[in-house]
């Protein structure tokens, strides 16, 4: 196998519409942030951004012909029911306690609705299940996947409205004299109180038994910004849904991890709507993470899939990775969980296809975005915080500059990064990103990145950028008189095309 070179052209616009001189002078004008923005501290040392693998690919790992390279993933766990003692534990409905719910065939389990559930029996069974699936209290993620009903009454729309109907019927059976309006109001109160009791109590039990696990619910928070058919779709979370999330303050305060999802359907393939959809779901998760304590937010781990939910044989393209992974990293979260069903590795030729996709598409992008994020964190935050967009709505990403860096896949199957950072790369970070300090750390944003001399960042199995920061090409003029130098520089910049630093968002893979 020869070497493969991945020329990542994801970097986005370096020069904006304000004029080329703005690029030269803006870094002298940017003030230090007057307010501190916080993010959750890393759960693993030297790991600004955490990659988590939650796909049942055991049969692919170690396969001599088509090994799956998981060296970039710090936490690996299978969602199989037989898997125990993993750093990532996913509790489905049948794996944690006696969760009251109604199945797709309308059969009621453990009371059906939470008001009829046996809470104490649920806790006893949940204790046994937690001790079974997490036998030791080691650091890890504990995600509860309860999707049958939602704790907010009004969010139980069709087909979940059977929970509302049965709740009203329960009230009417014990209070026949109530009007439908009165019965509905009482049903809302009973349902939401019982739902909260089950969800909040289960979190408290988990934290008591396994305090080193980060406990939370899959799909929480959500903001239902999925009306893609609206011609005015802008991705923003509806105000009413943000208000409903505010009313779930008890849930955010009880959670030690937040696990929103940004799975894509085929209609969002290489689509601007996907960018907006992911962006504002993550923005809402960041907002919610600070409800309990703005200076000590809850860590956010965003669920993604490598395939489209309604076309599971089709993998995400490079643009789709930017729309998901690129957005998540640029906004400043704790990590990404890649999940999928057993079919991903069990289809005919599933392992070879997954292996090739990871080798040529996913892993090179992980190398790219992780090293860029670490470089930015090291430059702006002295590794005491993570970089996040100054303006959340801007289309800027934490990517290596394709003019200066190549990512190579060597004959040994390892990745190597060629190239050195330049001052302009660091200035790009400083212009478009701010330092969001890690909680419980004293953090001050670097005011002048021109003073940064070295970059030393690594990812995975020793894939690193360790280099001196090179000056921008213009500085090689070494002017004898500053006025002559600035006149010459201004003349050169004036005649440069406005899009000189605008790169297409595609990846070129070539064999030298």
Swiss-Prot record:
Function description: Involved in sperm-egg adhesion. Upon fertilization sperm must first penetrate a layer of cumulus cells that surrounds the egg before reaching the zona pellucida. The cumulus cells are embedded in a matrix containing hyaluronic acid which is formed prior to ovulation. This protein aids in penetrating the layer of cumulus cells by digesting hyaluronic acid.
- What reactions does this protein catalyze? Random hydrolysis of (1->4)-linkages between N-acetyl-beta-D-glucosamine and D-glucuronate residues in hyaluronate
Gene that specifies this protein = Spam1
PANTHER family annotated for this entry?
HYALURONIDASE (PTHR11769), HYALURONIDASE PH-20 (PTHR11769:SF17)
Q: Does Thylakoid show up as a keyword for this record? A: no
MF term (GO), any:
hyalurononglucosaminidase activity
What residues form the catalytic site here?
A: 147 (proton donor)
The text of the family note is: Belongs to the glycosyl hydrolase 56 family.
Task: Assign the protein's first listed, main location to one coarse class.
Answer: membrane
Protein name, per record: Hyaluronidase PH-20
Query: Where does the UniProt entry place glycosylation sites?
Result: 46, 165, 293, 368
Upper taxonomic lineage: Eukaryota, Metazoa, Chordata, Craniata, Vertebrata
